[in-house]
Every structure is written in structure tokens, then in C-alpha cells.
Design a protein with these regions (language model features):
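Conserved thiamine diphosphate
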Residues: 2-6, 88, 137-193
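Cofactor-binding active-site loop characterized by glycine-rich and histidine/acidic residues
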Residues: 2-121, 134, 139-141, 150-154
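Short catalytic-loop micro-motif centered on adjacent basic/acidic residues
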Residues: 18, 94-95, 171-176, 198
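Conserved active-site and cofactor/substrate-binding residues in soluble primary-metabolism enzymes
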Residues: 22-26, 36, 70-74, 107, ...
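Generic beta-strand/beta-sheet core signal
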Residues: 42-44, 175, 200-202
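Short gly/pro/ser/thr-enriched loop/turn and capping motifs at secondary-structure boundaries
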Residues: 48-49, 126-131, 206-208
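Short hydrophobic alpha-helical runs that function as membrane-insertion/retention elements
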Residues: 120-123, 173, 200
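Flexible, low-complexity linker and terminal segments
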Residues: 205-291
Length: 291
């Protein structure tokens, strides 16, 4: 994938209510750069809803439609159809968290994907219900400590990318704010495609992950370089393409930098490494590249 020059215009304003060092806030800024001014965003309850601000105030320079947890993709589908009926060329994008995507909103998202609604759905995955106090979601990885899994989560993270790929939507991709050219480029690419598009953005959470407020981007890069969060695209549910070749550093470098994994034993870390390696080899087979 080519390197993109970041657009100069900003559509996310200062003065919003995010935590210092919030990767979601930076991710939203980059996504809005890729969307541009001819866009409307649909936001369910989440950290993003808090950042967007209470009506009539807004931290975004594009129209914002705040909806219920369960209805993000459904509301966006209606808006997209309305703009099409009016003959207006507007990108309708969903900006949601993992709780509103992997869990509460998955029924509406699956329905929209099955109908191939003309929406761009962006999930900011901070791997827990962070806006309500760091409870586990189905996006929380195995072993991660949350307020509802104080000994570490006992089940695996849901594979939302494979779920979306199984719908055979035109475009799905992973991204993270640690590589802004990759993220903005994928948003721009998705914006030019018709039908349901999905981008999953890893978004380290400062309080939830137990990291200093100047480390969220470092953690995002460690996730990519350790292959815990590979950057890739899936087109039509079949064509897998890596967009960055990771360094392949030990996953321990990523895990040990977070308090939510401080309780893990060396055996636990080795088990996670084995799972990361297994998933990486599976991805490599699908891309047809050499590991």
C-alpha cells in the first residue's frame, strides 16, 4: 500500500473531553481527515459520544447523529438511503467503540452488511467498555484484567474481522493511529467504494490499559510490530493483503508494557505468543505471502 500524505484540514476540534493521551481521540481525528467535509457521522454511546459533546455543542466540523447503542448501523443505513434519495453525495460513517460493535450493535451491523448498505463503519477498539469503567467486552483479549475480570479474562477475543469478511462486504481493514498514513489511506480508499465498508482501529486506553498518557501510540506500534494487531485489508471477503510487514518482535514487549497484563506468568505470555503466531500464519496463508 502506498504512503499517503495526510490532509491538512482538521474536522476534529480542540477542547473535547477525552483523557490526556487518548488514542481514540487521535484516531477520530485521522478518520475525519480521511472522510473530509462531505460526510456525516453516526455515534452511539461511547467515549466518542462524550468527545463529540452535548447538543447543541460539537467538537466535530461535520454533522453528528447520536443514536442508541443497538442502532448505529441501522441509523446510518437510513441516513445513507435518505441522502441517496435526495441525490446528495455524502459519506455516512459510523464511529463506534468495541462494546457497541462486537456486542450490543452487532445485530444491526450484520444486517447492514448482509444488505450491503452504503455505509462506512469504523470501530475504535480499546478492548473493553472503557467509557463505563473498564468492564470486559467480547473484544477483550484472553488474560486481560478488567474490573469485571479481575483475574484476567478467561475467554478469547471475538474475531470481528473474520465475521465481517464472512459477510463478503466490499472492504474491511485493520488500522491503528500509530501509523496515520495507513489509517487515513484506508479511510480514503473505503470512502471511494460503494457498499458496506468496515475498519477496525486499535485504540489503546490510558486508564483501562494502565499505561502512561504519553505511551498510547507506542503501545499501538508495539501491537502491530509484535503481530498482535497486524495491518491488513480484506476485499470481497476473499482477497487478503498485508499493508505493513511487522518486525515480529516478541509479544511480551507489548504485554509487559501494560498494567492489565501485569499478573500474567511467563507461561501465560508463552501461550499468548503461540496464539499470535498461529493467527499470523493463518493470515499469511490467506494473503499468499511468505512468512
Amino acid at each position: 500500500m502506498k504512503t499517503y500524505a495526510l490532509p491538512e484540514s482538521d474536522y476534529f476540534l480542540s477542547g473535547h473531553a477525552s483523557c490526556p493521551g487518548c488514542a481514540v481521540a487521535l484516531g477520530v481525528r485521522f478518520v475525519l481527515k480521511g472522510l473530509g467535509p462531505k460526510s456525516v457521522v453516526v455515534v452511539p454511546p461511547s467515549c466518542i459520544a462524550v468527545m463529540a459533546g452535548p447538543m447543541p455543542l460539537s467538537s466535530m466540523r461535520v454533522p453528528v447523529f447520536q443514536t442508541a447503542f443497538e442502532t448505529t448501523a441501522a441509523a446510518a443505513s437510513g441516513l445513507a438511503r435518505a441522502y441517496k434519495a435526495l441525490g446528495e453525495d455524502v459519506t455516512v460513517a459510523c464511529l463506534a467503540g468495541d462494546g457497541g460493535t462486537y456486542d450490543i450493535g452487532i445485530q444491526a451491523l450484520s444486517g447492514a452488511a448482509e444488505r450491503n448498505e452504503d455505509i462506512l463503519y469504523v470501530c475504535f477498539d480499546n478492548e473493553a467498555y472503557q467509557n463505563t469503567g473498564n468492564q470486559k467486552s467480547s473484544a477483550t483479549p484472553w488474560g486481560a484484567r478488567t474490573t469485571s475480570t479481575p483475574r484476567g479474562k478467561a475467554t478469547r477475543k471475538k474475531d470481528i474481522m473474520e465475521i465481517m469478511a464472512a459477510h463478503r462486504i466490499p472492504y474491511a481493514a485493520t488500522a491503528c493511529p500509530g501509523y496515520p498514513d495507513d489509517l487515513v489511506g484506508k479511510v480514503e480508499k473505503a470512502r471511494a467504494i460503494r457498499g458496506t465498508r468496515f475498519i477496525n482501529v486499535l485504540s489503546p486506553c490510558v486508564p483501562g490499559w494502565g499505561i502512561p498518557d504519553d505511551r498510547s501510540l507506542r503501545l499501538a506500534r508495539l501491537a502491530v510490530e509484535s503481530r498482535a494487531w497486524p495491518l491488513y485489508e480484506v476485499e470481497e471477503g476473499l482477497r487478503y493483503t498485508l499493508t505493513r510487514e511487522p518486525a515480529g518482535i516478541p509479544v511480551a514487549e507489548y504485554l509487559r508494557a501494560q498494567q492489565r497484563y501485569a499478573h500474567l506468568t511467563d507461561a501465560d505470555v508463552a501461550e499468548i505468543q503461540a496464539e499470535v503466531d498461529r493467527r499470523w500464519q493463518q493470515l499469511i496463508r490467506r494473503t499468499g505471502e511468505q512468512s
